[in-house]
């Protein structure tokens, strides 16, 4: 009986499935209806190519990009080797530069526990990236038009890191565009070895006979302002400070600290970004051999590389002043400043007769292996940690004379480095350059 009921139930299911299947099957197609009314045409979209070629054309971006390849920002920047260094990268990598500008990072030192900390830094995650177009033109690809070239990343007044933010550079010409350059092209701070705060440069001028380093590296250090080593220096980008007439150790003297007209009426762009000529001008940022910026309306007339009053004479004056100051920076006939005849590593080879590079003549076989050979009158003993020296190098170091420095000598070293590494031999700011050098010469015995 149960089997019969099961068979009967299965039959009903099959019949039901057939009925439902038949109900869902489409019927025959009906007669076609009349066509509906056409809609209106849509609005044409924006031509993307037309927007791009406003900038990406042979005469605009392509030209600037080619010029940039010839610039030191393009091929010689230290972005790779400094990447990750939160102190150095604000001037060596794109992300770090944009970070300090966007966040208005102060160039101050603050006390943290028992030591001072340099606040002008980025963070590890924003410490990479080559210098590119967007480093200075941070609004690129915002509206996708020529308007994106400006505003520049910053034209604000620049707080000087060398002075821990107590001095400021603000160059007014061309809407402050030079401030963008000076943001990086400025000297770095000297740190007082005993206090760890920024060096008190004013004290160097008010107490010139005081001791900056007494020749003993006692621990803890309670007296020495510096422990001089080969790399005790202002770094390399001093041009902004000299151009602005700020930042030097201003010893009192007979030569007044004034500026040439360049400081008020000229901009970096006037001379370094003129019409391209060979490997100079435009976004090469190279001014070598170009005088169109000098010969602009309201400035000079007919100035060339052979012009005496405004080119050859002032440069010769500054070179002689550098030589005269170096001659006074000696101890028992031994140069305090380092000589380096190698034209590849010494960018300032031609700026002084004895080919000083701005470093100190202190023994450092790691970073300056040819130091003793390059300085025939002698080299001073290393004052810092020598644990990385081989035993033979330690033996050499032990036999070398000890260096000592007065405040006047330390301040004069700083001024020598500022004026040498300005790299213009006074053209940026002849009056201020000569005041620093002449008054430094006069303060030394």
Where are these regions (language model features)?
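Bacterial N-terminal signal peptides that target proteins for export
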Residues: 1-10
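Core hydrophobic alpha-helical transmembrane segments of single-pass membrane proteins
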Residues: 11-16
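C-terminal motif of bacterial Sec signal peptides marking the signal peptidase cleavage site
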Residues: 18-22
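C-type cytochrome heme-c attachment and multiheme electron-transfer modules
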Residues: 23, 35-445
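Bacterial lipoprotein signal-peptidase II cleavage site
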Residues: 24-30
């Amino acid at each position: 009986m149960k089997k019969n009921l099961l068979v009967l139930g299965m039959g009903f299911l099959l019949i039901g499935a057939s009925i439902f299947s038949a109900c869902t099957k489409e019927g025959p197609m009906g007669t076609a209806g009349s066509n509906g009314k056409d809609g209106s045409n849509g609005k044409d979209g924006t031509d993307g190519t037309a927007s791009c070629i406003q900038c990406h054309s042979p005469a605009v971006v392509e030209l600037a990009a080619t010029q940039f390849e010839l610039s030191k920002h393009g091929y010689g920047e230290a972005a790779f080797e400094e990447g990750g260094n939160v102190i150095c990268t604000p001037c060596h990598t794109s992300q770090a530069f944009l970070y300090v500008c966007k966040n208005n990072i102060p160039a101050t030192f603050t006390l943290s526990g028992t030591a001072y900390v340099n606040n002008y830094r980025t963070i590890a995650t924003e410490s990479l990236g080559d210098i590119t177009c967007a480093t200075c033109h941070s609004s690129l690809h915002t509206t996708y038009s020529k308007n994106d070239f400006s505003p520049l990343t910053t034209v604000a007044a620049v707080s000087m890191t060398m002075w821990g933010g107590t001095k400021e550079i603000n160059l007014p010409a061309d809407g402050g565009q030079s401030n963008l350059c000076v943001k990086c092209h400025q000297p770095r701070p000297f740190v007082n070895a005993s206090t760890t705060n920024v060096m008190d440069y004013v004290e160097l001028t008010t107490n010139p006979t005081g001791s900056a380093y007494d020749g003993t590296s006692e621990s803890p250090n309670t007296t020495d302002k510096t422990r001089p080593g080969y790399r005790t220096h202002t770094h390399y980008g001093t041009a902004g400070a000299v151009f602005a007439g700020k930042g030097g150790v201003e010893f009192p003297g007979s030569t007044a600290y004034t500026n040439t007209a360049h400081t008020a009426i000229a901009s970096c762009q006037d001379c370094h970004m003129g019409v391209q000529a060979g490997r100079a001008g435009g976004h090469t940022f190279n001014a070598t051999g170009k005088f169109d910026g000098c010969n602009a309306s309201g400035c000079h007339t007919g100035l060339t590389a052979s012009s005496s009053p405004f080119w050859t004479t002032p440069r010769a004056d500054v070179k002689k002043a550098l030589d005269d100051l170096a001659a006074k920076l000696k101890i028992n006939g031994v140069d305090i400043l380092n000589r380096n005849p190698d034209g590849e590593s010494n960018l300032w080879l031609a700026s002084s007769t004895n080919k000083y590079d701005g470093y100190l003549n202190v023994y450092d076989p790691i970073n300056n292996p040819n130091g003793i050979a390059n300085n025939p009158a002698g080299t001073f003993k290393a004052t810092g940690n020598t644990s990385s020296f081989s035993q033979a190098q330690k033996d050499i170091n032990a036999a070398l004379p000890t260096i000592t420095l007065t405040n006047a000598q330390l301040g004069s070293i700083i001024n020598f480095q500022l004026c040498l590494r300005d790299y213009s031999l006074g053209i940026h700011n002849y009056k201020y350059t000569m005041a620093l050098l002449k008054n430094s010469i006069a303060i030394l015995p």
